[in-house]
């Protein structure tokens, strides 16, 4: 087969093909004087030889070994574009070499008696294509080479500069006779301009061999049913080898044995462009048109030929065809699917009535000017057997190389052209010469599949810079470059489907701005089509080169090319990977694809240039209709997790995306003790967490909370942890003030009890962390398991708000030896002021609070109170207005005792109490402790082993705890419960070395003592049970110290002795205050510390059945004697009305009157009754509100 240079007429549609293929005035030996390409099938060819003096350069074409009776070669004219301008000086001689014809061309029916140079009609149909011409019979015998007809002697059959021809093959039952087709006309001037604009010369085009092809001898029988379409070879002009584009590179016989890797590589080079935007496109309307018209396509070629005359729009699908075309074979043998497609010559006169789909991207106007990558349809429609081409409005045409069979043959010929007047006219004729052999004969699957395999391998590895791989399956813009009409050889039914009967007209002055693919108005349609794609695993893996090559190299690909093959080959061209960044810019379907493994288009280059910090986050969530714009997978997931669910991608690959080596392992137990503080603005960014859940649990809903010095600052949303790595992407900006510790707490949500449970936690020491560097990436070790990857940044550092607290200042109260504190305060007492003030305030207003010392106060308020004691313990006031929550004060007191360097109950005292317990154990009964009074005195004497300051402090503390325990009927804090709260505090054996804060013990005995919390509780319980009650100790000691607070101590009242059985005989049982169910004085979350066994199960469930078992503390009866003692006042300041006898339906006015009772009442006689009346008031109010029978009167 001759190699056709880039300036050949077959490539550009001028006169180049004819002028370069035949000498002037000569024709092929077997060429009749008829005009059309169809005559090539009816015309006999005795020899395939050039008729001019110009020597031909040939290469061996693919042969059909089953049919070479005449020794003829399968020569296929190749139209290859070139970027070279060196051919501008080339001119065709007067007698170009004759155009060689194939014997099988005699089966192409064309119109007869048309001159080669005669322009085609403009009236919407071409005479050469008319029905009467199509019905002209072609002789089965071969005509002599000397036969002549109109225009034969004038030169090349492709001389007409404005027209083009289509070689079509009909069914075998059609008549045979001389018919004529108009050749494509390509001028040298146009060809040179196209070559200059094409820029399609690649490295593989330079080293083409120039051999002489053997002459064709003998004859070859042409059968209407079996004969393959063979296109005659053309003459080649002598051009430099670096500018020569061989004909065989654009025309491939699907006969597998003759397809070589070199030709496939050159084929790929030809279909790849640089710097041009696609002209044609796949729109939703276009796909609908394909489906609609494919159902209407007749199987009869005669009917199709008749329809072809009146059809004004012919769609050449640039991408995949419907399923019925992908799965059907069209030709019967390997010799029957030679395709000859020539797209050349612009003819504005042909575009008025026949507009091809080459410009059908204008149909996308109703779709928002979009174009999609091909999406094969699953609809099984009828098989279309006719191939019809008409005139086109498009200036340029480009079709995918192997993605679909546009023609039934396996040989591929592409022609590309630029319009000469593309900017001034949108009417361009793209006459197409196509050859199709017998309509429904199946193709041998091995040949075309081999071609596709080799072709895809070439495409998969070819990644030259500047090659627009993505452009190959699409039509080029008529105003922005060149295009190719590609007829691919595959085993599918490859035919051109007609376009919509009402396509949008071509817009002359505006081409679609493909650089803005965001103008997509139908994401729902894309999603629907994408869901169909996901049925094929190869396509849902974004069709990477690796996946494509693995598929093509498998031995299972020998059957006919199915939809899988077609789709893979196509996406090899438009692979949205790093091979072609320009192609990725226009890869619209990858953005609008529900497969989250496909990288987004906008973020693609960014991800290539630098590693993304995160992948999933909650990120962008699809609303169910519009596809996701951003990927949920990392770069690892995009490469290795194709087709997987988004959960698998986002959870399993996020750990690989972050650079774990960049995170420094951080453990709180390894950090030195820090007494400094820091203030400023801190940024915390979570990257992810690891090993948060046990492997046996399928999933866990968790969230992470940020605490600064035990104060909640921020939290994440509820996240689902399904794998060992929890992907996170959360940033928080937190203001810190005098902060020390950043605590990261992971909570797990338990839906059954509907509460949060601490899963794990980790702590970071902020002052030490930010001492040198302000930014740290830490892998914080969590307890009891797990790691959390976090980036902590101190964006701004402020001065500490505590005036007396510098960042390097050591604490003076907390964590300091008690003797040093007392010496520094120097107030004449042996007890630190913190203990004194806290105990005094608790006894003043907290002894009757339920759960005292068991409930936790606000961490923020506790921190504030701690700082106040650190500044000046003498100036701290604990009045109720400033600290209304008594639990804050109790919390600070326990913190102080817990942080003492040495416990108050020393090891010596601990052992002494254990000996006393062995000698004189507790004698407990229902009435309480029944030990001898001597045991109490002996217990007090046990403290003599302590130093003076520790002894005085412990005595004050035990007195206070004994007083609190005396109110256990109200506050439920018995000696046992108090021992549970204070045992680990007073007996902790904590000794911190200078470098680490983890606990160390000098010997095994101390270790056993520190871990034996039960013993601690028993020791303290023994002391409290035998400790004598000294109620006025605190009052006497504080009267001299704080005279200004003397009056406040009058609120302390001694509770009356409680009867063992409440006598209800003299009271109205209906007026007795009944505790409300679930009446709590504190939140539920604070009520589960320590041992509540002494409270019993019926504490909150008091009913009528157990009324006699309930202890009511000073609950008076509601009779008329309540107000009798309130008639006299000591002062005139407050006037209290005599309350009327209260009944069950007492009025609210009475309650308000009783609330006005002040401390001016005689404290000796009325204080107790006043308190009881207030309790009654509150109880009655609650009861009335619960019954919704409150009668308010003001």
From Swiss-Prot:
Name the GO terms of the biological process aspect.
activation of GTPase activity; cell migration; regulation of Ras protein signal transduction; regulation of small GTPase mediated signal transduction; signal transduction
Report which superkingdom the organism of origin falls in.
Eukaryota
Cite the entry's keywords alphabetically.
Answer: GTPase activation, Phosphoprotein
InterPro entries in the cross-refs = C2_dom, C2_domain_sf, Rho-GAP_regulator, Rho_GTPase_activation_prot, RhoGAP_dom
- GO cellular-component term (any): cytosol
Q: Name one GO molecular function term.
A: GTPase activator activity
Where the record annotates domain Rho-GAP, the positions are 816-1031
Is Phosphoprotein among this UniProt entry's keywords?
yes
The region called Disordered is annotated at 1-106, 133-182, 1057-1080
SUPFAM superfamilies for the chain: C2 domain (Calcium/lipid-binding domain, CaLB), GTPase activation domain, GAP
Tell me where in this chain the PTM Phosphoserine is found: 315, 317, 622
User: C2 domain location, by residue?
Assistant: 660-779
Q: List the SMART domains hit by this protein, alphabetically.
A: RhoGAP
Residues carrying the site annotation Arginine finger: 854
Its job: GTPase activator for the Rho-type GTPases by converting them to an inactive GDP-bound state.
User: What PANTHER family is this protein classified in?
Assistant: RHO GTPASE-ACTIVATING PROTEIN 100F (PTHR46150), RHO GTPASE-ACTIVATING PROTEIN SYDE2 (PTHR46150:SF1)
What name is this protein filed under? Rho GTPase-activating protein SYDE2
Q: What is the lineage of its organism?
A: Eukaryota, Metazoa, Chordata, Craniata, Vertebrata
């Amino acid at each position: 087969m001759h190699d056709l240079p880039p300036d050949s007429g077959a490539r550009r549609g001028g006169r180049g093909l004819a002028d370069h293929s035949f000498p002037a005035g000569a024709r092929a030996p077997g060429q009749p004087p008829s005009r059309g390409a169809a005559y090539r099938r009816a015309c006999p060819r005795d020899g395939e030889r050039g008729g001019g003096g110009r020597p031909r350069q040939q290469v061996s074409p693919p042969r059909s070994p089953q049919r070479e009776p005449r020794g003829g070669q399968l020569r296929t004219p190749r139209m290859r574009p070139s970027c070279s301008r060196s051919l501008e000086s080339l001119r065709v001689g007067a007698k170009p070499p004759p155009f060689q014809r194939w014997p099988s061309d005699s089966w192409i029916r064309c119109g007869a008696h048309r001159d080669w140079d005669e322009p085609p009609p403009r009236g919407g149909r071409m005479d050469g294509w008319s029905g009467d011409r199509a019905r002209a019979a072609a002789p089965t015998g071969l005509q002599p080479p000397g036969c002549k007809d109109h225009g034969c002697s004038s030169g090349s059959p492709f001389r007409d500069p404005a027209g083009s021809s289509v070689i079509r093959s009909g069914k075998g039952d059609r008549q045979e006779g001389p018919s004529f087709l108009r050749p494509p006309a390509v001028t040298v001037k146009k060809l040179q301009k196209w070559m200059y604009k094409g820029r399609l010369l690649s490295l593989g085009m330079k080293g083409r061999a120039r051999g002489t092809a053997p002459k064709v001898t003998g004859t070859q029988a042409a059968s209407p049913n079996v004969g393959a379409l063979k296109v005659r070879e053309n003459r080649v002009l002598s051009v430099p080898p670096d500018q020569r584009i061989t004909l065989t590179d654009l025309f491939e016989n699907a006969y597998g044995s003759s397809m070589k890797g070199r030709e496939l590589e050159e084929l790929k080079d030809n279909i790849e462009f640089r710097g041009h935007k696609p002209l044609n496109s796949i729109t939703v309307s276009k796909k609908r048109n394909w489906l609609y018209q494919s159902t209407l396509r007749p199987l009869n070629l005669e009917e199709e030929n008749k329809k072809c005359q009146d059809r004004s729009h012919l769609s050449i699908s640039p991408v995949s065809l419907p399923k019925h075309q992908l799965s059907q074979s069209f030709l019967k043998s390997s010799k029957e699917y030679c395709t000859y497609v020539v797209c050349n010559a612009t003819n504005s006169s042909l575009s008025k009535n026949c507009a091809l789909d080459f410009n059908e991207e204008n149909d996308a106007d109703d779709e928002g000017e979009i174009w999609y990558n091909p999406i094969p349809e699953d609809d099984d429609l009828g098989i279309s057997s006719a191939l019809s081409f008409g005139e086109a409005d498009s200036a340029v045409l480009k079709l995918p190389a192997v993605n679909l069979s546009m023609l039934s043959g396996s040989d591929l010929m592409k022609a590309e052209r630029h319009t000469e007047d593309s900017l001034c006219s949108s009417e361009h004729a793209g006459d197409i010469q196509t050859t199709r052999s017998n309509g429904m004969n199946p193709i041998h699957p091995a040949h075309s599949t081999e071609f596709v395999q080799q072709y895809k391998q070439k495409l998969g590895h070819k990644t030259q810079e500047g090659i627009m791989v993505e452009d190959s399956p699409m039509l080029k813009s008529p105003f922005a470059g060149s295009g190719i009409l590609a007829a691919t050889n595959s085993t599918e039914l490859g035919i051109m489907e007609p376009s919509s009967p009402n396509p949008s007209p071509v817009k002359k002055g505006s081409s679609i701005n493909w650089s803005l693919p965001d103008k997509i108005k139908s994401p729902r349609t894309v999603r629907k089509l994408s869901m169909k794609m996901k049925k094929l695993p190869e396509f849902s893996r974004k069709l990477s080169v690796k996946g494509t090559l693995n598929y093509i190299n498998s031995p299972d690909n020998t059957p006919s090319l199915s939809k899988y093959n077609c789709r893979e080959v196509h996406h090899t061209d438009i692979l949205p990977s790093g091979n072609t960044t320009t192609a990725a810019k226009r890869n619209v379907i990858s953005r609008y694809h529900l497969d989250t493994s496909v990288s987004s288009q906008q973020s693609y280059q960014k991800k290539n240039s630098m590693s993304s910090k995160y992948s999933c986050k909650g990120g962008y969530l699809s609303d169910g209709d519009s596809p996701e714009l951003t990927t949920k997978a990392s770069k690892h997931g995009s490469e290795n997790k194709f087709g997987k669910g988004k959960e698998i991608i986002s959870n399993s690959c996020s750990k690989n995306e972050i650079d774990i080596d960049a995170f420094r392992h951080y453990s709180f137990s390894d950090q030195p003790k820090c007494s400094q503080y820091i203030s400023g603005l801190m940024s915390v960014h979570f990257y992810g967490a690891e090993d948060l859940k046990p492997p046996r649990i399928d999933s866990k809903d968790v969230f992470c909370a940020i605490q600064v010095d035990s104060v909640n600052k921020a939290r994440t949303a509820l996240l689902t942890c399904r794998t060992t790595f929890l992907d996170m992407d959360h940033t928080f900006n937190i203001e810190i003030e005098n902060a020390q510790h950043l605590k990261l707490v992971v909570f797990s949500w338990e839906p059954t009890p509907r509460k949060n449970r601490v899963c794990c936690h980790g702590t970071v020491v902020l002052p030490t962390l930010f001492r040198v560097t302000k930014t740290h990436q830490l892998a914080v070790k969590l307890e009891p398991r797990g790691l959390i990857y976090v980036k902590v940044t101190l964006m701004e550092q402020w001065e500490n708000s505590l005036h007396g607290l510098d960042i390097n200042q050591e604490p003076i109260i907390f964590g300091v030896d008690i003797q040093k504190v007392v010496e520094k305060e120097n107030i004449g007492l042996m007890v630190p002021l913190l203990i004194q003030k806290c105990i005094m305030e608790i006894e003043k207003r907290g002894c009757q609070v339920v759960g005292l010392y068991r409930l936790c106060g606000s961490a923020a308020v506790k921190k504030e109170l701690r700082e106040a004691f650190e500044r000046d313990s003498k100036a701290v006031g604990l009045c109720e207005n400033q600290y209304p929550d008594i639990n804050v004060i109790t919390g600070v007191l326990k913190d102080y005792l817990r942080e003492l360097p040495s416990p108050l109950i020393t090891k010596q005292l601990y052992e002494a109490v254990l000996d006393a317990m062995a000698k004189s154990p507790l004698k407990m009964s229902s009435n309480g402790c029944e030990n001898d009074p001597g045991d109490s005195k002996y217990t007090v004497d046990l403290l003599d082993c302590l130093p003076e300051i520790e002894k005085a402090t412990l005595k004050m503390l035990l007195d206070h705890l004994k007083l609190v325990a005396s109110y256990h009927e109200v506050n439920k804090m018995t000696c046992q419960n108090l021992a549970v709260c204070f045992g680990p505090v007073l007996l902790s054996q904590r000794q911190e070395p200078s470098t680490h804060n983890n606990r160390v013990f000098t010997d095994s005995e101390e270790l056993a003592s520190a871990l034996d919390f039960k013993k601690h509780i028993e020791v303290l319980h023994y002391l409290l049970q035998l400790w004598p009650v000294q109620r006025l100790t605190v009052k006497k000691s504080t009267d001299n110290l704080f005279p200004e607070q003397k009056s406040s101590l009058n609120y302390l009242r001694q509770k009356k002795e409680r009867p063992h059985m409440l006598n209800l005989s003299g009271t109205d049982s209906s007026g007795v205050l009944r505790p409300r169910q679930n009446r709590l004085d504190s939140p539920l979350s604070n009520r589960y510390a320590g041992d509540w066994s002494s409270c019993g199960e019926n504490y909150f469930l008091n009913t009528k059945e157990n009324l006699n078992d309930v202890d009511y503390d000073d609950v008076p009866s509601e009779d008329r004697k309540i107000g009798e003692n309130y008639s006299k006042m000591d002062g005139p300041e407050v006037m209290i009305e005599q309350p009327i006898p209260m009944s069950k339906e007492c009025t609210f006015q009475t309650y308000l009157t009783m609330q006005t009772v002040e401390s001016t009442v005689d404290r000796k006689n009325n204080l107790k009754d006043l308190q009881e009346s207030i309790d009654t008031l509150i109880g009655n109010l609650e009861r009335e509100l619960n019954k919704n029978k409150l009668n308010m009167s003001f």
